[in-house]
Structures are given as C-alpha cells and as structure tokens.
Regions:
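Bacterial N-terminal signal peptides
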Residues: 6-15
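Sec/Tat signal peptide C-region and signal peptidase I cleavage site
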Residues: 15-21
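Immediate flanking context of iron-sulfur cluster ligation sites
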Residues: 25-27
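The canonical Cys-X-X-Cys-His
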Residues: 32-39, 97
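Axial heme c-ligation environment in periplasmic c-type cytochrome domains
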Residues: 44-53, 68-98
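Short hydrophobic/aromatic patches at helix-to-coil boundaries
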Residues: 100-104
C-alpha cells in the first residue's frame, strides 16, 4: 500500500510539473513575452535559456525576476529596457512564467 501511494504521489508531482511548464509557455505566448524573447536565442531581450542559466542555483532569483517582469527595468541584459507588465499581466501568471523560464 505504501508503495502504491508513493507511486501515485510521484506521478502526480511529475504531471503537475509538466502542466506548469506548459502553462508557463502558453502564458508567455498569450502575454506577448515572445515578441521580445525566445526560448533558445536572443531577440530583443535575452533567451529564456540564458536567463535560466544565469540564475541557476540562485535561491532568490524567482522573487527578483517576478518583480523585474512586473516593474520592468534595464541594464541587466543590455541597453534595451524591459517594459513593466503589471497590471496587464496578473501576478500569478507572471510567477508561472518565471517558474517556467527558470526550469529551462
């Protein structure tokens, strides 16, 4: 019985992770993020894989990136400023997108 519960719990977590990744990518598309970003190459802004690599292992990265996406800013990845995305993109959607980016 314990083995069955462990298998079910593990499968649930794996499927939830896949759903979050799909949700993050879909939200990035819907929110217009892909006008300036791409998963694997620089467009106007950095690629999402470059962002994930830069912040790999950084415990505070998610919170900082959520704020950066909300408020916008410049100077981190070059001279092109990132526009603020709040309130037009909901906070929970921004968090989902950032989690997806960091998972790449």
């Amino acid at each position: 019985m314990k083995v069955l519960l462990t298998v079910i719990a593990t499968a649930t977590m794996l499927l939830a992770g896949q759903a979050n990744a799909a949700d993050g990518q879909a939200l990035a598309q819907k929110s217009g993020c892909l006008a300036c970003h791409s998963v694997d190459k620089k467009v106007l802004g950095p690629s999402y894989k470059d962002v994930a690599a830069k912040y790999k292992g950084d415990k505070g990265a998610e919170a900082r990136l959520v704020e950066k996406v909300k408020k916008g800013g410049s100077g981190v990845w070059g001279p092109m400023p990132m526009p603020a995305n709040s309130p037009q993109v909901k906070d929970e959607d921004i968090k989902t997108i950032v989690q997806w980016v960091l998972s790449l």
